[in-house]
């Protein structure tokens, strides 16, 4: 068992609700056994200490992924459509924290985080009015495909655990209603994963194949729209890393920016 004491009651409630909802849908998430009346404390299942990030360490360091590592990645990316569609089925998105859905406001928050914590922090020269115009255009493009699916938001190898050779999901409490592309971009373009392009393309095909169980896929449109989400996710991460590196003075995050 793992005992958890969470400072944010809203975030705790999001996790507790989602964990129960996902388990009811047959998704591999930790079981919560008991919670306090105020939702500050709870006991959950211990999934061990094997992160997918660590399980693919050799591949990350050499960019040469062995068959066992590839198989773990295939299993994980093929699980994603089930999370997005089955996970969204019957979900009360009002529990999501801090936002119930991926919308223009949340997009502009992330883009302005990128502007203030990365562009301005690095002293980069740009025309602010034109940048704001581009931000609005990007928001319009990202929202042009309506969706009722679950968006994990931080679907990457540090948030997947390996138990008995299978992927299990953690740290999903920041999820919300949103398009499928964001999580694909988060997973396959994670900077420190160091996936070679050939492996990334292989995993994209695995994802699309699994996605077809839930909806028809226009591959040309899918790839075109995914490009915009890869750019957006990269900007969002650079903003977060910029804040940690330039404002909190943590050199590790400045080094991570260089990987992008």
Where are the model-predicted features located?
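An alpha-helical support segment within catalytic cores of ATP-dependent transferases
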Residues: 88-100, 105, 110-150, 220
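Short, solvent-exposed segments of well-ordered alpha helices
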Residues: 67, 101, 105, 194, ...
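Short, charged, amphipathic alpha-helical segments
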Residues: 254-258
């Amino acid at each position: 068992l793992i005992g958890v004491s969470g400072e944010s009651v809203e975030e705790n409630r999001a996790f507790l609700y989602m964990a129960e909802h996902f388990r009811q849908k047959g998704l591999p998430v930790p079981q919560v056994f008991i919670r306090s009346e105020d939702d500050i404390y709870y006991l959950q299942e211990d999934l061990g200490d094997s992160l997918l990030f660590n399980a693919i360490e050799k591949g990350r360091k050499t960019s040469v992924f062995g068959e066992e590592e590839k198989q773990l990645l295939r299993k994980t990316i093929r699980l994603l459509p089930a999370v997005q569609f089955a996970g969204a089925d019957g979900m009360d998105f009002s529990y999501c924290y801090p936002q119930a859905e991926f919308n223009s406001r949340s997009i502009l928050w992330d883009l302005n985080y990128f502007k203030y914590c990365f562009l301005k922090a690095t002293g980069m020269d740009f025309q602010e009015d034109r940048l704001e115009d581009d931000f609005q255009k990007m928001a319009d493009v990202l929202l042009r495909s309506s969706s009722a699916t679950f968006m994990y938001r931080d679907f990457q190898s540090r948030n997947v655990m390996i138990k008995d050779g299978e992927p299990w999901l953690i740290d999903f409490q920041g999820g919300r209603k949103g398009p499928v592309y964001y999580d694909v971009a988060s997973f396959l373009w994670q900077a420190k994963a160091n996936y070679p392009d050939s492996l990334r393309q292989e995993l994209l095909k695995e994802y699309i194949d699994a996605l077809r169980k839930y909806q028809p896929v226009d591959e040309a449109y899918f790839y075109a729209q995914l490009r915009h989400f890869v750019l957006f996710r990269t900007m969002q991460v650079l903003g977060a890393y910029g804040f940690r590196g330039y404002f909190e003075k943590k050199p590790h995050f400045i080094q991570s920016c260089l990987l992008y």
